[in-house]
Amino acid sequence: MAKRVYAIAMRYAQALYELAKEQKSLDKWQEDLQDLSSLTEDASVAEFLSNPKIASARKHKVLAKLSNIDPLMLNLVDMLVATRRLGIMRAVSGEYNRLLNEARGVEDAIVTTAKPSSEADIEIIRQQLSKITGKKINVVTATDPGLIAGLKARIGDKLIDGSVSRRLVLLQNEISQGRI
């Protein structure tokens, strides 16, 4: 089921990306998608949009008034509502961002540290990850006190684990196997 949703979201995102590229509106559409994604995750908005008793034209007008979104983007919402796929809006937005980042040579890195990092530390991490990947890195930070110290960085499907908790697990394995 998840693969099917991803495949559908990917098709929508690819079509949107091509259209935005054609109209030279890549960044604007990225913002619009993020706004729509947040808006459609609101329970009352999702309920309103999914209500079959409310005419599509009225839904369209309300969305247009709620946001400053490109009319073509509103057509996407109309289509998702009509096909009962409004729930994939977040996936469409995420896939669009991935396509945009890929075209620009940018990769997202989720960096988790034991405690919040300073901007200077984040910049150093960004530079190091950029050297490793050869791409520009967009850092998203998270904290997990369970790491004790160090960091974990997830870039796509790769994980760089430089945490003290991971080193302790490795040390424990070495001791339990009698290597130390």
Curated annotation (Swiss-Prot):
Its main location: membrane. Coiled coil: none annotated. InterPro entries: ATP_synth_OSCP/delta_N_sf, ATPase_OSCP/dsu. Pfam families: OSCP. The keyword Nucleotidyltransferase does not apply. It is a peripheral membrane protein. GO terms for molecular function: proton-transporting ATP synthase activity, rotational mechanism. Keywords: ATP synthesis, Cell membrane, CF(1), Hydrogen ion transport, Ion transport, Membrane, Transport. It is found in: Cell membrane. One of its GO terms (cellular component) is plasma membrane. HAMAP family: ATP_synth_delta_bact. F(1)F(0) ATP synthase produces ATP from ADP in the presence of a proton or sodium gradient. F-type ATPases consist of two structural domains, F(1) containing the extramembraneous catalytic core and F(0) containing the membrane proton channel, linked together by a central stalk and a peripheral stalk. During catalysis, ATP synthesis in the catalytic domain of F(1) is coupled via a rotary mechanism of the central stalk subunits to proton translocation. Belongs to the ATPase delta chain family. NCBIfam families: ATP_synt_delta. F-type ATPases have 2 components, F(1) - the catalytic core - and F(0) - the membrane proton channel. F(1) has five subunits: alpha(3), beta(3), gamma(1), delta(1), epsilon(1). F(0) has three main subunits: a(1), b(2) and c(10-14). The alpha and beta chains form an alternating ring which encloses part of the gamma chain. F(1) is attached to F(0) by a central stalk formed by the gamma and epsilon chains, while a peripheral stalk is formed by the delta and b chains. This is ATP synthase subunit delta. It comes from Dehalococcoides mccartyi (strain ATCC BAA-2266 / KCTC 15142 / 195). The gene is atpH.
